[in-house]
Amino acid sequence: MNITQVKIKKLENFSGSLPEYATEHSAGMDLIAANEQPITIKAGEIQLIPTGIAIALPYSFEAQIRPRSGLAVKHGITVANSPGTIDADYRGEIKVILINLGTQDFVIEKGMRIAQIIISKYERILWEESSILTETMRGSGGFGSTGV
């Protein structure tokens, strides 16, 4: 397994621990809320939650912010723009856009695990305009065409 080092900066509002893998085969690392005061997310509302960290990804890497399944299933709290993308050239604070899809208000406390961050390699592409695309068995079928 290859391991890539990524620089991480603790900002003034940082608290808790740096993101880390929970198990040997975890894909994501938990992000921790770094809000000074509790933030209430009312049912149906969206809030931007600080994490107190900034990162310097190597070029050809991206980070995705994804929901934590426990928050989603127990409280209806998820990442509104899931997955949120952090580009390699972004150097600002990582913030998480949470939405409350539940029926009860939910309070985000400082130090709470609010989302996961997954770091991945990507490739850039160059579009080649064409009037003909190769045929496939699926063709243009989409949006449930292969079953529910």
Swiss-Prot record:
Gene Ontology molecular function terms on file: dUTP diphosphatase activity; magnesium ion binding
Broad class of enzyme this protein falls into: hydrolase
Catalytic activity: dUTP + H2O = dUMP + diphosphate + H(+)
Cofactor(s) essential for the protein: Mg(2+)
Keywords, alphabetical: Hydrolase, Magnesium, Metal-binding, Nucleotide metabolism
Documented EC number(s): 3.6.1.23
Recorded metabolic or biological pathway in which this protein acts: Pyrimidine metabolism; dUMP biosynthesis; dUMP from dCTP (dUTP route): step 2/2
Positions with a binding annotation for substrate: 68-70, 81, 85-87, 95
UniProt GO BP: dUMP biosynthetic process; dUTP catabolic process
Recorded family membership: Belongs to the dUTPase family.
Function per UniProt: This enzyme is involved in nucleotide metabolism: it produces dUMP, the immediate precursor of thymidine nucleotides and it decreases the intracellular concentration of dUTP so that uracil cannot be incorporated into DNA.
UniProt-listed NCBIfam families: dut (TIGR00576), PRK00601.1 (NF001862)
Designated name of the protein: Deoxyuridine 5'-triphosphate nucleotidohydrolase
Organism of derivation: Rickettsia akari (strain Hartford)
